Amino acid sequence: MKIPHRTTSSLTLLTVLALITSIAAACSAAEHSPGSTSATTTRPASPFDPTEKPPSPIGLLLAYRAIDEIGLVDGTNVVASVSGTFGSSNDLITTEDGKFVFARTTDNKIATLDVESGKGATREVPVGPTLGTGGAGTIMWLEQPNRLMQLDLADPDSQPVLHQTVDLPPAAGGHLREPRLVAARGGTAVIARVEAPPSPFGGPDTLYAVRGPAAPTPLGQADANSPVSVARLSPDGAELTYALYRSTDSSCGTAAVVLSGADGTQQTFEVAGPDADRGSRVPKLWWPVTGPPKLSLVTWRCDRPETSSPLVWQLAGETSDTIEEVSPPTSALQTIDVAPGQRALILPETGGYAEPTGTLVLEESTRRISIKSGVDAIAAIRPSP
């Protein structure tokens, strides 16, 4: 099923970047049968030190974050890992140069894994609640009240340095809340702040794009009464996609997906179905180095706690002007194409969406091989030439 979009005029991220440039020069597991849906537009850890060097990569590697470790997979084998306790999020887990896997521990430290050596460590560096990337082997976070901080993972002795001070414009009404980093990638950081009278559900957010020394540029107010927490920038930082969740009460709400595109418009895809008694949510968004952004979508009946299996969708078309289920229809929290005929998937532990973690499996034809349980995020790493 393809869904057209609702188009409205807005200042898009690409337009913002152009403006700023001018100013500042991812054993067998059971298969799940995908359901159907309809949509309409608009862990401190001891450092991991292997006794011998991991096998040389034979192809694309998979990085993963689980509740108890971050790791690397070659084929179906975990070849390196770092123990820790990790919460689920939509944060990136690999640096832009593909040389490090990283994640924030629940006690606010940073676990890292060197892809080439297989060595890992836990850095005694307090980081912010949301991590992004800042180019090459650096990571980035927001330190209150207005400091974008950066850490170079390639230097084991590095300390956080100030990347940029972000002075958001004043807002009327006295309802300001602390800003939050929503995403950072490709030289762009997106920051959210509640500026209007907040709803009981925490929103709405006003979004800003930050790139270079120029002043942040507003991207507008999110059309939702809940905070924006699931978002992803394109690899070059030129486009942004994020999920909306419009709460109707504590147990229900509906989802939409927004893309700030390259054509001067903002596209909103209303992925909620027409049934007012059904809720929907986007728990995960990812944007591969190549290809369109993808997302997992879950639905449920508002009068029942059970949810359906998450289904994978993607933005499609030459200008990402439609949204559709991937082919073949896939029930998973996240997917990555590994090789022709092979995919890595995070499958829910149960048939429905009960928690944001699942089992990482490698799928080849009709066979699925389990690799690791309790996984909530994966990313592809291509070996350096």
What are these regions (language model features)?
Residues 28-31:
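Bacterial signal peptide processing site
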Residues 47-52, 86-98, 125-138, 169-185, ...:
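Repeated scaffold domains used in trafficking and secretory/extracellular systems
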Residues 23-26:
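C-terminal motif of bacterial Sec signal peptides marking the signal peptidase cleavage site
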